[in-house]
């Protein structure tokens, strides 16, 4: 089965504030865009992915990600991340009612297509399933099988919240690139150690952070 991914991205000017100790105000928007571009490019290259819908109200991000082949869905209603994801899932399903839908974080710059395919193939076995992040507190992917609502519960302690909602936690090994989201400088260094995509490698080079880059 191939999946449609829904990728949320907030306005670039407000993105990645927790990277303030690593990247200044003038660099963070470009870094957030680079993360999203590398995430979307890798997702579109995965054999398990049919297409990618990016949920954003940022015109620059929308233009750049559409150029990669993503569909852009307006960031609405104005009710936060989970409302936007639920809306986007409904938009996707309006045209493909039998599609499996998965929400994927936009800050996975080390994402590898084959590892994403493994996660999505495992998710096929369950009505709803999720993958915890590298910190084992949050969530990087939430999948809903055809005919099932996504019911996103992203935010603080989303791992516990998704588990409480009835979604099955995927305990896969060897999928570090799908779990390594980037919120802090330490996260970015961990992603660089895995090997990030070309756009993140170029943006991170301006930060003078040591570590392997662009090898994936």
From Swiss-Prot:
Phosphoenolpyruvate binds at residues 139, 155, 158. Gene3D superfamilies: Spore Coat Polysaccharide Biosynthesis Protein SpsA, Chain A (3.90.550.10). It catalyses: phosphoenolpyruvate + GTP + H(+) = enolpyruvoyl-2-diphospho-5'-guanosine + diphosphate. GO terms for molecular function: GTP binding; phospholactate guanylyltransferase activity. Its EC number is 2.7.7.105. InterPro entries: CofC (IPR002835), MobA-like_NTP_Trfase (IPR025877), Nucleotide-diphossugar_trans (IPR029044). Pathway: Cofactor biosynthesis; coenzyme F420 biosynthesis. One of its GO terms (biological process) is F420-0 metabolic process. Coiled coil: none annotated. It comes from the Bacteria. It is an enzyme of class 2 (transferase). Keywords: GTP-binding, Nucleotide-binding, Nucleotidyltransferase, Transferase. Guanylyltransferase that catalyzes the activation of phosphoenolpyruvate (PEP) as enolpyruvoyl-2-diphospho-5'-guanosine, via the condensation of PEP with GTP. It is involved in the biosynthesis of coenzyme F420, a hydride carrier cofactor. Belongs to the CofC family. This is Phosphoenolpyruvate guanylyltransferase. It comes from Streptomyces avermitilis (strain ATCC 31267 / DSM 46492 / JCM 5070 / NBRC 14893 / NCIMB 12804 / NRRL 8165 / MA-4680). The lineage of its organism: Bacteria, Bacillati, Actinomycetota, Actinomycetes, Kitasatosporales.
């Amino acid at each position: 089965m191939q999946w449609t991914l829904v990728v949320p991205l907030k306005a670039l000017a407000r993105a990645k504030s927790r990277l303030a100790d690593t990247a200044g105000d003038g660099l963070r928007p470009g870094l957030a865009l680079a993360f999203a571009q590398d995430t979307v490019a890798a997702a579109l290259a995965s054999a398990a992915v049919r297409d990618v819908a990016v949920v954003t109200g940022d015109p620059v991000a929308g233009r750049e990600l559409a150029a990669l082949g993503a569909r852009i869905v307006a960031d609405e209603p104005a009710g936060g991340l989970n409302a936007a994801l639920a809306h986007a899932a409904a938009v996707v399903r309006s045209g493909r009612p039998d599609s499996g839908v998965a929400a994927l974080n936009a800050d996975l710059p080390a994402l590898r297509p084959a590892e994403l395919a493994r996660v999505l193939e495992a998710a096929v076995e369950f009505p709803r399933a999720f993958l915890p992040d590298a910190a084992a507190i949050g969530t990087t992917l939430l999948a809903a099988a055809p005919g099932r609502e996504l019911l996103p519960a992203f935010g603080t302690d989303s791992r516990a919240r998704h588990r409480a909602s009835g979604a099955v936690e995927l305990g896969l090994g060897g999928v570090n690139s799908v779990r390594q989201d980037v919120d802090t400088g330490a996260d970015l260094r961990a992603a660089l150690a895995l090997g990030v995509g070309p756009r993140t490698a170029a943006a991170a080079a301006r930060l003078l952070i040591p570590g392997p880059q662009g090898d994936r």
